[in-house]
Amino acid sequence: MYNNYIFDLYGTLIDINTDEWNDDLWKKIAILYAYKGAHYTYDELNEEYDRLVQAEKKAVLKKSPDTKVVDIKIEKVFRKLFTQKGVKVTKAEVLFIAEAFRCYSTKYIKLYDGVLDLLDTLKANGKKVYLLSNAQRSFTENELNMFDLTKYFDGICISSDEECSKPDEKYFKTLFDRYGLEKSESIMIGNDYISDIGGAADFGIDSLYIHQSISPEIDGELRSTYKVMDGDVFKIKKLIINHS
């Protein structure tokens, strides 16, 4: 019997399309930096952003060499883009840049059909619901709130907080240790056959794979216990709730 249902977020509960390589995005962000006195051309800003992201990843790996799949706190990058131009900013100003970046880069965002029904059913049946997401808190917290999803979760892990991502077993262990979960009572639900499903298999828990349009192409073994290949969230209940 499953008592703990662990969800991926993007591509599983939330359908999202973003474009972080669009010139218009970087032109707008460059204007916001210029408002505070940090002047960049848009292509310079894009290049510096990419460079600082890689530098942050190296710094995390140096600090935690046992981490196999690194994540970073993107706010550090946005702050450094100010400081290397000699501009001091507050935490709130950095957060605003992060939120603007996410907003300008998002082409659409919505819940998949059936998500609220699924979560309501889990809670009505006394199940525990957890989030294990490869994401940035400065992006994800707002998006959880906009869809009123936070109330459903008994625990939330966001990779930027831990500086570690799926499919790293270390990240799965963080969730299980923090909330005292048993592997035999837990199942991972996600749309990425490597990060979600491969990670769950390596960690030793069951999983359900749901294929969505933004899912990476499956190139190898799909190691899930269950699968929904047509993206129909409503089918999840029949597979892993009614028979749990």
What are the roles of these predicted feature ranges?
Residues 1-5, 15-19, 36, 40-43, ...:
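Asp-based, Mg2+/Mn2+-dependent phosphohydrolase catalytic module
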Residues 8:
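Short, acidic, Ser/Thr-enriched surface-loop or helix-capping motifs
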Residues 18, 66, 70, 103, ...:
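Pocket-edge positions in alpha/beta enzyme catalytic cores
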Residues 20-33:
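Basic, amphipathic juxtamembrane/active-site segments
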Residues 30, 43-99:
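A metal-dependent, Asp-based hydrolase signature
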Residues 31-35, 105, 160:
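A short acidic, glycine-rich active-site loop
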Residues 69-76, 91, 103-130, 141:
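Short, acidic loop-to-helix structural element flanking the phosphoryl-transfer center
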